[in-house]
A protein has these predicted regions:
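Short capping/hinge segments at domain boundaries that bridge a core fold to an adjacent linker or tail
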Residues: 1-26, 49-50
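Alpha-helical tetratricopeptide repeat
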Residues: 7, 20-31, 56-58, 92
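TPR-repeat structural position
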Residues: 16, 20, 36, 49, ...
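Leucine-rich, amphipathic alpha-helical/linker segments
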Residues: 16-46
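The canonical alpha-helical register within tetratricopeptide repeats
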Residues: 25, 45-46, 58, 71-78, ...
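Structural motif corresponding to the intra-repeat A-B loop/turn of tetratricopeptide repeats
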Residues: 33, 46, 66, 101, ...
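Short, well-ordered secondary-structure microsegments
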Residues: 36, 40-83, 87-95
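Internal alpha-solenoid helical repeat scaffolds
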Residues: 82-181
């Protein structure tokens, strides 16, 4: 309808630069209203990968493990790899996304990238602590890991928490529905 007409008119009348600016303003409008799905759509249409990345991280912190991965998958997958590799939160998201799509090889690849990121950071480095926290989260929640190692993993993570070496984001990959956890 009318929306399609407006898009057609925009394509006809606006330069590429003006279109990007319009999508950026639209993204900001939705972001301020905390409508991240529409904001992500606008920022993606405008080609603003850094804003997409920033919003995915913010959304992951607002709704950690509450099933947002499936809803946000196309945005995660649209990001350049370098952007994902710079963020522990995005690497964690990619690892879980791949696992939920039963791409366990991809999931373990992103887990490995996150592990390498954590190893490059110092013990007192905030980014390193965040990466180690996200690794602990993945150790507990990745579905391909099964329940066999959990009897060792959970006490080890508990010790890290008590020593304040990690802080765990909350999680429920089943959208807070009952699960094996």
């Amino acid at each position: 309808g009318f929306r399609a007409f407006l898009r057609w008119e925009m394509e006809r009348e606006y330069t590429e630069e003006k279109r990007k600016a319009l999508f950026s303003r639209g993204g900001l409008y939705y972001e301020l209203k905390e409508d991240y799905a529409h904001a992500l759509e606008c920022y993606t249409s405008g080609g603003d990968h850094s804003k997409v990345s920033e919003l995915l991280v913010r959304n992951a912190e607002l709704h950690p493990g509450m099933g947002h991965y499936a809803e946000m998958e196309k945005y995660y997958r649209s990001l350049p790899e370098a952007e994902i590799l710079a963020s522990p939160s995005l690497m964690q998201g990619m690892s879980m996304l791949c696992a939920l799509a039963m791409d366990y090889e991809g999931s373990e690849r992103w887990y490995g990238e996150l592990q390498a990121f954590a190893e490059r950071c110092g013990r007192q480095d905030a980014a390193g602590k965040q990466a180690r926290s996200r690794l602990a989260w993945l150790d507990i929640s990745l579905p391909q890991r099964g329940v066999n190692g959990l009897t060792e993993t959970i006490p080890a993570v508990f010790r890290l928490l008590m020593n304040k070496e990690v802080t765990l984001p909350s999680f429920s990959v089943t959208s807070a529905l009952p699960s094996i956890m």
